[in-house]
Amino acid sequence: MARGNDIERVVADNRKARHDYFIEETYEAGIALTGSEIKSIRAGQVNLRGGYVRIVDGEAWLYDVHIAPYEQSGAYFNHEPTRPRKLLLHRREISRIAGQVERQGYTLVPLRLYLRGRRAKVEIGLARGKKLYDKRDDIARREARRDIERALKERTRR
C-alpha cells in the first residue's frame, strides 16, 4: 500500500517548453510558498507558460509563474500571482546548474509542477532553444510516425 508521501499528482505541465527547447537535464526542486499559494496549487490554479528560473546570489528563483489568488480567502491574506518564488535545491546542485547556465544559449525552464504527498515540487529543465527549422523537423518526424502507424493499422484490419 502506498504511503501518503509517495503519491504524486501533476498539477501543471509546461508543454510549450518542450516544444520551444531541447531539454538536456532535469532537476527536482521544492518551492517556498505561502499558505494561499499552496491552496491554489492544490486547486490546480497554476500556469507555468512563460516561466523561467534564474540563479541570483547563489539562490535559485522562479519567475513569471502564475499562481491564481485563492478564491476562499480575503484580499488581505492573498498573494501576488506572479511574484518570484525561491526554489529549494542543494548548494552543490545550484552551483552545478549555475556553471551550466553560464554556457552560451542555455536557460532553466519549469517543466511541470506536482504535489508529492503534502509538498509542492517543480521539475526544472536545463534547456537550449530550438530554431525554427528544428521545430519543423520535429513536426515532420511526428507526421511521418503517424502516417506509418496509420498504414500499419489499415494493413492489420485486412
Curated annotation (Swiss-Prot):
Gene Ontology MF terms in the entry: RNA binding
Keywords noted in UniProt: Cytoplasm, RNA-binding
Entry's Gene Ontology BP terms: trans-translation
Gene Ontology terms: cellular component: cytosol
Keyword Ribonucleoprotein: no
Source organism superkingdom: Bacteria
Keyword flag Methyltransferase: no
Subcellular location: Cytoplasm
Primary residence: cytoplasm
InterPro entries tied to this protein: SmpB, SsrA-bd_prot, SsrA-bd_prot_CS
SS bond list: none
Family: Belongs to the SmpB family.
Function: Required for rescue of stalled ribosomes mediated by trans-translation. Binds to transfer-messenger RNA (tmRNA), required for stable association of tmRNA with ribosomes. tmRNA and SmpB together mimic tRNA shape, replacing the anticodon stem-loop with SmpB. tmRNA is encoded by the ssrA gene; the 2 termini fold to resemble tRNA(Ala) and it encodes a 'tag peptide', a short internal open reading frame. During trans-translation Ala-aminoacylated tmRNA acts like a tRNA, entering the A-site of stalled ribosomes, displacing the stalled mRNA.
Record's protein name: SsrA-binding protein
Originating organism: Roseiflexus sp. (strain RS-1)
Gene coding for it: smpB
